[in-house]
Design a protein with these regions (language model features):
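Acidic anion/phosphate-binding donor-loop and adjacent secondary structure
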Residues: 105-111, 143-164, 226
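Conserved donor-binding/catalytic core segment of Leloir-type glycosyltransferases
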Residues: 124, 160-178, 184-191
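Aromatic "clamp/platform" in nucleotide-sugar-dependent glycosyltransferases that forms part
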Residues: 239
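Membrane-proximal helix-turn-helix segments that form the acceptor-binding/catalytic region
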Residues: 62-72, 103-137
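Nucleotide-activated donor-binding/catalytic signature segment of Leloir-type glycosyltransferases, i.e.
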Residues: 203-225, 233
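Short hydrophobic beta-strand element within catalytic cores of glycosyltransferases
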Residues: 256-259
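Short glycine/serine-rich donor-binding loops of glycosyltransferases
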Residues: 244-247, 265
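Conserved acidic donor-binding segment of nucleotide-sugar-dependent glycosyltransferases
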Residues: 271-272, 276-283, 291-297
């Protein structure tokens, strides 16, 4: 959403990003005054990890209500809980648009998530599989607003033919739905078959103890495009995604891609043409797909 905010600001629109301390259906574990204080101390109103345009107003509010939301033309919600808050706002706040970025059921409350699609809002989805899902639940047409990548940043700088054919990169995550455990299970069998295997992970976490010593790990890499360009293959074993950015970024940087056959990869992958697609939760399939690429450099 910060990228959207920057792009809108560049077009001359007045943009405000609101971060709410309270959310519908989420119980607060600490007093409101304490949360306010912590957010101020952390400087959380503006992201430290993203270069937000100085023309964008970004602030912390107690809640998404008429008292805290400024009048405007269009208002976006980016999480199912905040969609409920949008539905209660005055028309003066703008046309409410619920931007669905994933099937957000990993914290439970699936019935409430589905019900959010039936709220009297304009609904938009970032991928075709989400568009179909929301249309089915809402009974209304849903606007497709697909994700995109910055091809001025993510571009091929090293010819694939010059890369190590046995170099593989993957995202490390401790979220079970990302499927990292299936990748880790494939590492030693692959290395036994290909002693020259060079496997790398990147992620936000400190290096996990579960990784073999021979595996390279990059924590919060500052130049992700360069990292993609250092590898011949990108691997994603996600069980579910809204519209996954890393495989698309890797493609733009010239990597061959192996990824799971899920909706979040479907908008930019075509089996055996733009990617090798594998079933979820399947270590054997990971090994087979990588073996195919290792043994067929032309692919």
């Amino acid at each position: 959403m910060y990228e959207y905010a920057n792009r809108f600001a560049a077009l001359g629109h007045q943009v405000t990003v609101l971060h709410s301390l309270r959310r519908p259906f989420k119980k607060m574990r600490s007093p409101l005054w304490w949360k306010r204080l912590i957010f101020v101390i952390r400087g959380a109103a503006r992201p430290a990890w993203f270069s937000l345009d100085s023309r964008v107003t970004s602030k912390i509010v107690d809640e998404f209500s008429d008292s805290f939301v400024p009048d405007g033309d269009i208002l976006f919600s980016t999480w199912w809980q905040t969609a409920y808050a949008l539905a209660k706002l005055s028309p003066r706040k703008g046309v409410p648009v619920n931007l669905v970025q994933d099937y957000e059921t990993w914290t439970g409350q699936e019935d409430l998530v589905k019900s959010s699609y039936r709220l009297p809002l304009q609904h938009a989805a970032i991928s075709n599989w989400l568009r179909v899902l929301v249309e089915k639940e809402s009974g209304r047409s849903v606007q497709l607003l697909p994700n995109a990548i910055d091809t001025s940043r993510f571009t091929q700088t090293v010819e694939p033919a010059l890369r190590d054919n046995f170099s593989v990169l993957a995202l490390y995550s401790e979220e079970s739905r990302k499927g990292t455990r299936y990748i880790i299970s494939a590492l030693e069998p692959l290395r036994a078959q290909y002693p020259g295997l060079h496997f790398s992970f990147f992620g936000v976490y400190p290096r996990p103890a579960s990784l073999p010593e021979w595996v390279q790990y990059y924590q919060k890499p500052t130049n992700l495009a360069a990292l993609y360009n250092q590898h011949a293959i990108f691997l994603s074993a996600s069980l579910g995604e809204g519209w996954a950015l890393p495989p698309a970024e890797a493609m733009a940087c010239g990597c061959a891609v192996v990824c799971t056959d899920i909706g979040g990869h479907a908008d930019y992958t075509k089996a055996n043409e733009t990617a090798l697609l594998i079933p979820t939760e399947n270590t054997t399939a990971i090994i087979t797909a990588l073996t195919t690429l290792f043994d067929n450099k032309a692919l």
